[in-house]
Amino acid sequence: MHGESPIKRRESRKIWVGSVPVGGDAPIAVQSMTNSDTNDVAATVAQINRLEAAGVDIVRISVPDMDAAEAFGRIKQLVKVPLVADIHFDYRIALRVAELGVDCLRINPGNIGREDRVRAVVDAARDRGIPIRIGVNAGSLEKDLQKKYGEPTPEALVESALRHVEHLERLNFKDFKVSVKASDVFMAVAAYRLLAKQIVQPLHLGITEAGGLRSGTVKSAVGLGMLLAEGIGDTIRISLAADPVEEVKVGYDILKSLRLRSRGINFIACPSCSRQNFDVVKTMNELEGRLEDLLVPLDVAVIGCVVNGPGEAKEAHIGLTGGTPNLIYIDGKPAQKLTNDNLVDELERLIREKAAEKTAADASVIVRG
């Protein structure tokens, strides 16, 4: 039952990616990217539907050639979530997906080609109200910047980004967001900090090629957590060598931990020790699996003993503290004693009842408003 986040977000210009606002006073958007073959329309649509069920706001799709562009058009007709087309090298692919209804173009103006080709892409985006993401990556810096700096640095990333920002602004195009990603946490954080002071456009955060599920989660939580805590960031993507659905889950968990955005259960659980009166780890695993479908933001504390249990339980919407017997707290007050028999079943029932109650209360406030 914690309050609003104390974080003051950086002021930025609001743009729209399809129906999703990005920047300004909009909630921080959670993005992911498909890892299926774009030409396999059925598989890609199925993956996007799973991402949408997990709560994704925006999905990026790689479009490497014209065949993939045509597949993108078919995919776009079959899903509801806004789609970003990831385009490199061939400007004609960007023009084609613009015709097919793309919600955002992710390009690097530096590898699209001559000025007239960049202008053609920008004109197509402007005519159709399509925003652009300038995506700068430490692994693909321009050769002159590599030569100037000797290696990727925060300053090199920012110089590349500003070069592309100026390019779009010369063409009088303002609906864009920017990212300056690196796999090194310190480099990425320093680059975003520098860039945030120099432009007003929304910033898309990410630690690129972060790693597998565990290592990538840790890297992303550290890097993005530092930036988000400073108010920097308008969209996030957790890059994991894992099921893309995990990217969405981790993204929401990072935002929940900073009280920037809530979706579903925020669990507070002890790591357990010999004082526990019930199996905390088993209980948590079962609850997380059973309650994945709940979208209502609730704090649920699961603490195995009476050392910290009552204090944590009193701060949660629903709290369980181990003892003889165990004790359930609801809205900070002792409500029910429980034995270990059917502990998870009863706790699930109470959480679902609380979620339904909160949903009804929120709906009532909206109606009265």
Swiss-Prot record:
Catalytic activity: (2E)-4-hydroxy-3-methylbut-2-enyl diphosphate + oxidized [flavodoxin] + H2O + 2 H(+) = 2-C-methyl-D-erythritol 2,4-cyclic diphosphate + reduced [flavodoxin]
Lineage: Bacteria, Pseudomonadati, Pseudomonadota, Gammaproteobacteria, Pseudomonadales
Record keywords, A-Z: 4Fe-4S, Iron, Iron-sulfur, Isoprene biosynthesis, Metal-binding, Oxidoreductase
Enzyme class: oxidoreductase
Domain of life: Bacteria
E.C. no: 1.17.7.3
Cofactor remark from the record: Binds 1 [4Fe-4S] cluster.
Homology family: Belongs to the IspG family.
GO biological process: isopentenyl diphosphate biosynthetic process, methylerythritol 4-phosphate pathway; terpenoid biosynthetic process
Matches recorded under Pfam families: GcpE
Protein task: Converts 2C-methyl-D-erythritol 2,4-cyclodiphosphate (ME-2,4cPP) into 1-hydroxy-2-methyl-2-(E)-butenyl 4-diphosphate.
Molecular function GO labels: 4 iron, 4 sulfur cluster binding; 4-hydroxy-3-methylbut-2-en-1-yl diphosphate synthase activity (ferredoxin); 4-hydroxy-3-methylbut-2-enyl-diphosphate synthase activity (flavodoxin); iron ion binding
Pathways per UniProt: Isoprenoid biosynthesis; isopentenyl diphosphate biosynthesis via DXP pathway; isopentenyl diphosphate from 1-deoxy-D-xylulose 5-phosphate: step 5/6
Residues the entry annotates as binding [4Fe-4S] cluster: 270, 273, 305, 312
Protein name: 4-hydroxy-3-methylbut-2-en-1-yl diphosphate synthase (flavodoxin)
